[in-house]
């Protein structure tokens, strides 16, 4: 909460990934720095995960985030992609800290069906990122 009070125009997230680029082009999701914890501050290159403690001030986000038909059509399995690129389009920065563990905890044998299979291992996040960027007319 302290981080949010000190940065009211930012999205505050405990768990983030750092997006990486090659020659100015966004690298595939698998090539990003995941569960990034070497940064304390805000950046436009931090990609918040929508779990693990994320505060998104509704007043700073575009109303288009509520366009459920488009969301369901182009990135139904990646709400974090939808929210992150909507925020990036509006130039909203993400702030994080470096003093909490960024790795999620899962209970053995409860994650047989999981989004990581579809979104990370099979490249679903990259497809959904491209679809959202195309929809938002994002470079």
Model-based region annotation:
Residues 1-69:
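Conserved catalytic core of nucleotide-sugar-dependent glycosyltransferases
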Residues 59, 63, 68-139:
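C-terminal catalytic/acceptor-binding lobe
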């Amino acid at each position: 909460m302290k981080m949010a009070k000190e940065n009211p125009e930012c999205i505050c997230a405990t768990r983030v990934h750092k997006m990486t680029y090659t020659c100015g082009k966004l690298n595939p999701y698998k090539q990003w720095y995941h569960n990034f914890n070497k940064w304390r501050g805000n950046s436009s290159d931090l990609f918040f995960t929508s779990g693990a403690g994320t505060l998104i001030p509704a007043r700073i986000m575009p109303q288009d985030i509520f366009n459920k038909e488009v969301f369901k059509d182009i990135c139904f399995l990646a709400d974090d992609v939808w929210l992150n690129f909507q925020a990036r389009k509006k130039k909203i920065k993400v702030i994080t800290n470096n003093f909490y563990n960024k790795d999620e905890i899962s209970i053995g044998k409860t994650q047989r069906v999981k989004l990581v299979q579809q979104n990370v291992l099979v490249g679903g996040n990259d497809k959904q990122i491209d679809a959202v960027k195309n929809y938002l007319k994002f470079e």
